[in-house]
């Protein structure tokens, strides 16, 4: 038994340290699985207390899953030790979750790193009384379909619980084919069949349609890319959740999902979704909506102590956008004018009023 398991067992007060964690069933593996943003202290160190507070906020808001680490900056710019410590803290916190499945990101630069993180995550999960899942994307350094496929096949032999596959990393790394994803789900039925379709635009819709046709071998297809097409993909294609780094809007995202599940009986789903789209589309405000100005909200909520980010020293522009390169970073603060803060605050208060009205109906 590893040291991580012993320490976690002590933290959770488990009498039987070797007990196997509950594995979430397919019903739990649907809905908004939001990616937690990584918070930082003034010196650039990871603020693990804030990370736990953020995860608890997502759970209390009604999200069905909390994923960490999963976004590019958290995968590339955190040290292995920082990722392990964050996961330890989150597994302890997840014991008191009432809604969310803790989903541990195990993505690595290569297959060996991915498998090492997965083994560590399984060691932690084996001590958790709460259901735990995993999430992975193709290894950053993979350049051929064969390399991507080999990684997921190897991971399928290590994982003992559901793994959400994110299909896209960068233009340099090929996305796994739909045929391969379906075959994986058939060969590893307790592990695969949960897909975050990360392709963009019309290609995402085409792939999702293929994946959903493969049900019940494929269990859940999640919308992605911030939820830009979530409403269409739910109504026209049948996606059953969202995976995205939009933690500040968790109460609204959870409300949208509940309304989707209920079949939109009052015809108000489109209004709720329009509110969400407006919140994430403040393009004139610095930083973008993925992390950027959302940090202002996370700090205002009392979850984060700073609005600092580790930012790539190098980046590259591709057809799919601008992507960070390497593992070197600088510490950058979010800088907003008073007018920008006022606009963001007005938008957030609008969301709160909307949710209060919906709750009173």
Language-model segment annotations:
Residues 49, 232-361:
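Structured C-terminal cap/extension of enzyme domains
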Residues 19-21:
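Boundary at the C-terminal end of the N-terminal hydrophobic targeting segment
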Residues 23-175:
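Active-site beta->alpha loop and helix N-cap motifs at the rims of alpha/beta catalytic domains
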Residues 154-162, 169-290:
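Catalytic alpha/beta core domains of metabolic enzymes, predominantly
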Residues 91-99, 126-131, 160, 190-191, ...:
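Structural alpha-beta junctions
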Residues 5-15:
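Bacterial N-terminal signal peptides
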Residues 47-50, 54, 82, 86, ...:
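General structural feature for long, well-ordered alpha-helical segments within catalytic domains
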